[in-house]
Design a protein with these regions (language model features):
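Glycine/proline-enriched, intrinsically flexible loops and inter-domain linkers
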Residues: 2-100, 105-128, 132-283, 287-497
Length: 497
């Protein structure tokens, strides 16, 4: 049995006719400037290093029907993640029940189309003249949401109940008044309630700033002009993607990649995708992927969507505006009970590793369709982390040793970089020492025992390798999810092109 997904086309029955293409481009950039301002607010005002230093967050604007209008994407995997939360809110709260001043919250992958529990979504309706017109939204990865281990992520967890507090789609503010009881309840189930309260308040304030900017845009342009321009932007994005699809050769293309294991050891787990190209559609079928993982490597279906959207945008048209028009020509399906579409209550916390492998498989499926300069070799597709926690100083000083991003034609292999999907910044050495008491004895861009014949060269990054002395910390030391795609055998000898 498969679980198909097709985002309904809101503009499929007409080719967009743009009376003012220059004005539409200006309007599109106005929207993106609002999301950029929201993102800067969220990063600069937050308290946890995961948001303010690593910038593991994204923001978006939706219209009253729940269509994505614009998104400021720090993390590629978030492209589409907020879309699932928006759908969950509208399923739970019909438009006639939404009031000015309400704020909504959710994080659950099964109850609210979330990505994994640390990613908490905050969504705020935007009213004009007493009528719901838009939503401002953001998603942020919180340092801890409870569960069995500090940081709430470990590849060996077996159930989502071990991973932290589950938040279905619910109202955290009514008519401008925050539900302090609900806020305390959520934060009391984490290891740092004070930090969670502060970050959630920052997320709500970020949406208020975005809502005010949207209302200012309506005040300046007029409501009808704004609504018409939104339709134009979405229709143009859809048409532009359809033009890119029309340039591809019709047919089906399959690629397979493998995870080392399912988070609990054992045999490699296949990640397989079959891309079917037609005149006006790209369909991604994940039949042939491995069964549902025993550990936390499972990828929720909404996160699978985000991987597909990111890969299509990156490969076919990186400058494509991130809005609902991007989703319309894309469909996907995955068998229920597999690692790419798990059943409740499978653990999903370490889904970033699987997401990177999925994106890599999609890149591979496109390899025969694109010119050499647009293709990319396999990447490290790994997201290792070590989490320290203790009573003093404020525990959880995460750091990572990043691997390689695949070589491209005319560009050298790049070490110390995430391959795809998870593009969070590394925590600065100074921040790690100040906030977590982590003593870093070395930080440079050289990575020893690098797989293959590549060399870091001028593309080395300072965060490629860090040696830390955790002895100043106290309490837990948790080895986070490790998903090296090639174990110790390396990725092969490679060859020059």
């Amino acid at each position: 049995m498969t679980k198909p997904d097709s985002v309904q086309s809101r503009a499929a029955d007409a080719t967009p006719t743009l009376a003012d293409p220059i004005g539409m481009e200006v309007f599109c950039n106005r929207l993106l400037s609002i999301t950029e301002d929201m993102n800067n607010t969220l990063v600069r005002a937050s308290f946890s290093t995961n948001i303010k230093e690593r910038k593991d967050c994204s923001v978006a604007l939706f219209d009253a029907a729940g269509r994505l209008v614009a998104q400021g994407t720090q993390i590629p995997l978030h492209l589409g993640s907020l879309d699932g939360a928006m759908r969950a809110i509208l399923r739970t709260f019909p438009a006639d029940q939404i009031r000015d001043g309400d704020v909504y919250i959710c994080n659950d992958p099964y109850l609210a189309d979330g990505s994994h529990l640390p990613d908490i979504n905050i969504i705020t309706p935007v009213f004009w003249d007493g009528v719901l017109r838009f939503f401002a939204a953001n998603i942020a990865h919180h340092s801890d949401v409870g569960g069995a281990v500090p940081g709430s992520i470990a590849g060996g967890l077996k159930s989502i109940f071990e991973e932290g507090i589950r938040i279905p789609a619910c109202r955290i503010a009514r008519a401008g008044e925050t539900d302090e009881d609900l806020l305390r309840l959520i934060c009391a189930n984490t290891r740092d309630p004070e930090e969670r309260v502060l970050d959630l308040r920052v997320q709500m304030a970020t949406n208020r700033r975005g809502a005010a900017a949207v209302q200012g845009l309506i005040r300046q342009m007029g409501l009808e002009a704004v609504l018409r321009s939104v339709d134009d932007v979405i229709a143009y994005t859809r048409k532009r993607l359809l033009n890119r699809i029309a340039e591809l050769r019709a047919g089906s293309y399959t690629f397979r990649s493998d995870l080392d294991d399912d988070g609990m050891g054992g045999d490699p787990v296949p990640i397989q995708v079959t891309l079917t190209v037609s005149a006006d559609n790209l369909h991604f079928d994940f039949e042939g992927s491995g069964k549902q993982a025993r550990g936390a490597m499972n990828l929720p279906f909404n996160a699978l969507r985000a991987c597909v959207y990111y890969a299509v945008k990156a490969l076919l048209d990186p400058d494509l505006a991130p809005n609902a028009g991007l989703f319309d020509p894309i469909t996907l399906s995955a068998p229920v009970g597999t690692i790419t579409n798990p059943e409740h209550p499978a653990a999903v916390g370490a889904r970033s590793i699987t997401a990177q492998k999925v994106a890599g498989a999609i890149f591979g499926a496109f390899r025969g369709l694109l010119p050499p300069e647009k293709t990319m070799a396999s990447s490290n597709d790994c997201c290792p982390a070590i989490v320290f926690s203790g009573r003093w100083p404020r525990g959880r000083g995460p750091f990572r040793v990043s691997g390689n991003a695949g070589r491209r034609r005319g560009r050298a292999l790049r070490c110390g970089r995430h391959g795809r999907g998870a593009r969070a910044h590394d925590q600065h050495v100074e921040s790690a020492r100040g906030s977590a008491g982590e003593r870093v004895s070395a930080a440079d861009g050289r990575v020893r025992d690098d797989p293959g014949l590549g060399r870091c060269g001028p593309h080395a990054r300072r965060h490629g390798h860090r040696q830390a002395d955790p002895r100043r910390g106290t309490g837990h030391r948790v080895l986070g999810p490790l998903g090296q795609p090639h174990r110790r055998r390396g990725g092969g000898r490679g060859r020059r092109t």
